């Protein structure tokens, strides 16, 4: 369980651009559309990726087999903790694949939210929810929530929906405090490693600023060009420093050679 679930706005598992399961905070209506746009523009050639813009942190964990683990959180959430969320989702997928069965077949040609029921307990564990029905109230657009709303007409109105959506991300339950400590201890060992991974992989990319699907690719390309420019500039500065050192050494040698000639009055010392 994360220390403050209210800081987590969205998290999901996707294969390619198909969202297999997701958690959507009721405090962020419509954020899943932004998340899908980000997933469609997943940065290539990265295993871990994080960027903060407009007080939101967008974090990716990308596997070679096209699985993408993605989250949107408040900028105040610590980076190691946001990476822990994605690593927890990754371990859940690895367990499903290891167990085999129909779940593996489902992943061959996945459909939207095909693993929602399987992964609801994992989302509940992450945000510290005991009752999965409460968790499902935040899974906006999931098959279970749509079916439940169709059975309950009182939720169709905005007023009824607000009444039905009980506060999910409040203070942790007392019964979960021990569980929270255990999870904090378990993820503590990964903090240093995740933090170092984040530092070397973080790029300055605006993932969803104006809704343009080409924003991420454009900004990533600009970032790479900027990195190349900085490398070239650093190389030029290094060459300049080398030449300065060589010229300084040459001047010292010339002065010492002149002093030697003056003391010996030419090359008489050698002739003697």
Swiss-Prot record:
One of its GO terms (biological process) is protein transport. GO terms for cellular component: membrane. It is found in: Membrane. Keywords: Coiled coil, Membrane, Protein transport, Transmembrane, Transmembrane helix, Transport. The chain crosses the membrane at residues 243-263. Disulfide bonds: none annotated. The keyword Disulfide bond does not apply. Residues 12-116 form the Longin domain. Its main location: membrane. It is a single-pass type IV membrane protein. InterPro entries: Longin-like_dom_sf (IPR011012), Longin_dom (IPR010908), PHYL (IPR044783). It comes from the Eukaryota. PANTHER family: PHYTOLONGIN PHYL1.2, PHYTOLONGIN PHYL2.2. Non-SNARE longin protein involved in membrane-trafficking machinery. Belongs to the synaptobrevin family. This is Phytolongin Phyl2.2.
